Swiss-Prot record:
GO terms for biological process: queuosine biosynthetic process; tRNA modification. Pathway: tRNA modification; tRNA-queuosine biosynthesis. This is NADPH-dependent 7-cyano-7-deazaguanine reductase. The gene is queF. It catalyses: 7-aminomethyl-7-carbaguanine + 2 NADP(+) = 7-cyano-7-deazaguanine + 2 NADPH + 3 H(+). It comes from Shouchella clausii (strain KSM-K16).
Length: 165
């Protein structure tokens, strides 16, 4: 395989740009995709995002988390710089932890239509409690729907030891 042709990258506008515009309000329009060159194969793509920040919708206090986003692509894949800028757009966005991870998953489903996706947020403690929301999705009527159900019920059977993150 010779790599990607320029025409395959025409929708990737942020990567390599000399001018990066950071959105300070939630904006899913910043997300970009590129074609999956291996749609005949199941494989997992995982993003580890240790610097996610959002705001408490009630107090305006900052919330910090590590996000884990994993998916099995179909035809489209999310471009990583656009994902970084998208996650940055949550910086001044007020939402609960549970809503944030579900919003991220829903936006990525709409963008890529993956076979399977999961988003797990591991938020730092506030008031002595950490919240770790997990959500996932598998295409309806496929084996990925079954995988999603299994993963949901078994995703945290062996929780880590919390050492104040």
């Amino acid at each position: 395989m010779a790599g990607r042709q320029e025409k395959e990258l025409q929708n990737v506008t942020l990567l390599g740009s000399e001018q990066t515009e950071y959105k300070y309000s939630y904006d899913p329009r910043v997300l970009e995709t590129f074609d999956n060159q291996h749609p005949y194969r199941d494989y997992m793509v995982k993003f580890n995002c240790p610097e996610f920040t959002t705001l408490c919708p009630k107090t305006g206090q900052p919330d910090f988390a590590t996000l884990y986003i994993s998916y099995i692509p179909e035809q489209k894949m999310v471009e990583s710089k656009s994902l970084k800028l998208y996650l940055f757009s949550f910086r001044n966005h007020g939402d609960f932890h549970e809503d944030s991870v579900n919003t991220i998953m829903n936006d990525l489903i709409e963008l890529m239509d993956p076979r399977y996706i999961e988003v797990w947020g591991k938020f730092t403690p506030r008031g002595g409690i950490s919240i770790d929301p997990y959500c996932n999705y598998g295409k309806k009527g496929t084996k990925y729907e079954e995988i999603a159900n299994y993963r949901l019920m078994n995703h945290d059977l062996y929780p880590e030891t919390i050492t104040n993150r």
